[in-house]
UniProtKB/Swiss-Prot annotation:
The gene is Med25. Keywords: Activator, Methylation, Nucleus, Transcription, Transcription regulation. It comes from Mus musculus. InterPro entries: Med25_PTOV, Med25_PTOV_sf, Mediator_Med25_SD1, Mediator_Med25_VWA, vWFA_dom_sf. This is Mediator of RNA polymerase II transcription subunit 25. One of its GO terms (cellular component) is nucleus. It is found in: Nucleus. A motif (LXXLL motif) lies at residues 645-649. Transmembrane segments: none annotated. Residues 395-545 are annotated as: Interaction with CREBBP. Signal peptide: none annotated.
Length: 745
């Protein structure tokens, strides 16, 4: 665990939303390594509080979110103009994304599609705002790295900002309080004009940092909202971070190349100096020639072989030879686990084929778990039955510190069961520590009780997470059902809070159990400040209750005054007693949660269920079709604050005849007429494409409306609508949060 060190001039506990917008053409390629070393890595260290490390699991819930947008030129057709990575809270993974950019194309163009990149970045900030509702305002920074002026063309791929020019986009960035910065290898007047137009209305800080921030007199570095080192280059820790990123191996020779990075990337910092007789442009050109030769020789179209040139200059080679790995198939039991950097992380705004969702880090709960051919997130039964579940095999070089049982409660799978009953699960587990570490576990009880907390509520506890020690949990796969349930819950946006009883005379009072989907291991964080951590958890739960109460009051006030005619009956239905709600539930069709359950269990799912028909808007059952509803979209009510709604959720109506009960334990039925924030059958990790379902469909069964088709792998990432919607990771319905928090409050 890396101790909680603060970066240069970095305020403690800074929660930031950072988006890097990078030109992915060959015009920037020869200069990117120098910009990365002198400006990008120091900026990441500033937001991360120190050099990014692969073992820093505390950063998974530290609050700061990073996202990457790569834009091209018009000659990239028919490919999408922009590639967008889903947000991550791991600075180390963000560095691997930077190293995986393929700088290609744009040789015949003097401009680049900066407007497309900035419009996608604005959509990301809109999504960040929805994710940050629990903690309020954050420090937002947009960093543009390019080497060409913008086209005089408006953005076309973005749905929200289509038609906006580059200048209007940077003005929107400044008006929304987003700090806009530019890094370019040469001084371009057009880019400086963009920086000036992005100045906030009331500029309270200097226009730019001192001139000596640039490490090269030819560079143009205009920054707001962050501090870069003045003079000198980046620290050795940043270079070691670069060294620790392995090259992604080709799938055909994964076992051979997995052992190659230690030899191909020797841990000697002086080797990051490029030989004097090779310029960066020559290195890029030779790599391109090698890549072309490998394509002709049939060695794979996307990867260049590891050659002596890369061994001589590893600091320059990876940015030009590294590429995102192709979609991965589920790893069979016992197969060697590829290195973390070989897993795909690029989520394009328009997927050209069946692309599988990326295994995400715990900080981005939306894309957790391995994507199986059925489209179900989470490890398969065959993988769970494998020897020690892949990543858990790494406990062989650790010391056993404690052995006992972990117990937790979850909702039973059939939704028809009384919601007041909880299903108690337990698994034998062992706690391991590294050699040389001393963990006093003599006074630990034999049974640890774990409660589940939505990880969104933990974003403000970043400093406490960093100031903690790390242990590894290993679970015995004797009970496959319990083990699958643990993987499903921990991989879908929840963290485990393990409480130690006050009767036990041990030093530890609370322990956080986190799941790393990339390494397939469970990590335990033991904060050094135990009392501060307990108080922090109590504070975030209290704040969550207050925020939900305020939202409920605002919804009632808004619904009584400004609700459109179509939404009026909905608010009236929500205000009626529970028995009326139960009567209204009867004539409705199959519950939406059952549709999600059919997708989760591999049953046929009707196509087009993600988005409503565009021909006629759907209203409540029995209401005539009217104009599309306008006004604010209401969030689901807080069942803890509304006793009537809570009693309804805790005592659902009996299942309808001919309708299978929902099988997914994490899907909850919503009150009738309440608009859904996300389509109920859509898992939290899948992007939201197309219009949202604002009303339940008419009283007809699904098979009579749409023909049934088996779900295809990756179908949730494909959409026939306009290109450009950005995934909304980490967005969870407040109904689920409150349901879990009932055990804590």
């Amino acid at each position: 665990m890396v101790p909680g060190s603060e970066g240069p001039a970095r305020a403690g506990g800074l929660v930031a939303d950072v988006v890097f917008v990078i030109e992915g053409t060959a015009n920037l390629g020869p200069y990117f390594e120098e910009l990365r070393k002198h400006y990008l890595l120091p900026a990441i260290e500033y937001f991360n509080g120190g050099p990014p490390a692969e073992t820093d699991f505390g950063g998974d819930y530290g609050g700061t979110q990073y996202s990457l947008v790569v834009f091209n030129t018009v000659d990239c057709a028919p490919e999408s103009y922009v590639q967008c990575h889903a947000p991550t809270s791991s600075a180390y993974e963000f560095v691997t994304w930077l190293d995986g950019i393929k700088f290609m194309g744009g040789g015949g163009e003097s401009c680049s599609l900066i407007a497309e990149g900035l419009s996608t970045a604005l959509q990301l900030f809109d999504d960040f705002k929805k994710m940050r509702e629990q903690i309020g305002q954050t420090h937002r920074v947009c960093l543009l790295i390019c080497n060409s002026p913008p086209y005089l063309l408006p953005a076309v791929e973005s749905t929200t900002y289509s038609g906006c020019t580059t200048e209007s986009l940077v003005q929107k960035i400044g008006e929304r309080g987003i700090h806009f910065s530019i890094v370019s290898p040469r001084k371009l007047p057009a880019l400086r004009l963009l920086f000036e137009k992005a100045a906030p209305p009331a500029l309270l800080e200097p226009l730019q940092q001192p001139a000596d921030v640039s490490q090269d007199p030819r560079h143009m570095v205009l920054v707001r909202g962050l501090v870069l080192p003045v003079g000198g280059s980046s620290t050795s820790g940043s270079l070691q971070t670069k060294q620790a990123v392995p090259l992604p191996p080709a799938p055909a020779s994964a076992a051979t190349l997995s052992a190659a990075p230690p030899q191909a990337l020797p841990p000697v910092p002086p080797q990051y100096q490029v030989p004097g007789n090779l310029s960066a442009a020559q290195v890029a050109a030779q790599n391109a020639v090698e890549a072309a030769k490998s394509q002709k020789a049939g060695l794979g179209p996307r990867f260049s072989p590891i050659n002596p040139l890369q061994q001589a200059a590893p600091g320059v080679g990876p940015p030009f030879s590294q590429a995102p790995a192709p979609p991965l198939a589920p790893v069979p039991p016992g197969a060697p686990k590829p290195p973390p950097a070989s897993q795909p992380s690029l989520v394009s705004t328009v997927a050209p084929g069946p692309v599988l969702a990326a295994p995400a880090q715990p900080g981005a709960p939306s894309l957790a778990g391995t994507v199986t051919p059925g489209g179900v997130n989470g490890p398969s039964a065959a993988q769970l039955g494998g020897p020690a579940l892949g990543g858990q095999q790494s406990v062989s070089n650790k010391l056993l510190a404690w052995s006992g049982v972990l117990e937790w409660q979850e909702k039973p799978k059939p939704a028809s069961v009384d919601a007041n009953t909880k299903l108690t699960r337990s698994l034998p587990c062992q706690v391991y520590v590294n050699h040389g570490e001393n963990l006093k576990t003599e006074q630990w009880p034999q049974k640890l009780i774990m409660q589940l907390i939505p990880q969104q509520l933990l974003t403000t506890l970043g400093p406490l997470f960093r100031n903690s020690r790390m242990v590894q949990f290993h679970f015995t796969n004797k009970d496959l059902e319990s083990l699958k349930g643990l993987y499903r819950i921990m991989g879908n946006g929840f963290a485990g809070c393990v409480h130690f009883p006050h009767t036990a005379p041990c030093e530890v009072r609370v322990l956080m159990l986190l799941y790393s989907s990339k390494k397939k291991i469970f990590m335990g964080l033991i904060p050094y400040d135990q009392s501060g951590f307990v108080n922090g958890i109590r504070q975030v739960i209290t704040n969550h209750k207050q925020v939900q109460q305020q939202k409920l009051e605002q919804q009632r006030g808004m619904g009584a005054q400004q609700a459109p005619p179509v939404l009026g009956p909905i608010l009236e239905e929500q205000a009626r007693p529970p028995q009326n709600l139960l009567q209204l539930r009867a004539p409705q069709p199959q519950p939406q949660g059952a549709v999600g359950a059919s997708a989760a269990t591999g049953q046929p799912q009707p196509q087009g269920a993600t988005q409503a028909p565009t021909g006629a808007p759907q209203g409540p059952p029995g209401a005539a079709p009217g104009p599309p509803p306008s006004g604010p979209i209401l969030r689901p009510q807080n069942p803890g604050a509304n006793p009537q709604l809570r009693s309804l959720l805790l005592n659902p109506a009996p299942p309808q005849t001919g309708v299978p009960p929902p099988q997914a334990s994490l899907h909850h039925l919503q009150p009738p007429g309440a608009p859904t924030l996300l389509p109920p059958h859509q898992s939290m990790g899948q992007p939201q494409l197309g219009p949202q379902l604002l009303h339940p469909p008419p009283a007809q069964s699904w098979p009579t409306q749409l023909p049934q088709r088996a779900p295809l792998p990756g179908q949730m990432l494909l959409s026939g609508g306009p290109r450009g919607p950005v995934p909304q990771p980490g967005l969870q319905p407040s109904v689920m949060e409150d349901d879990i928090l009932m055990d804590l409050i």
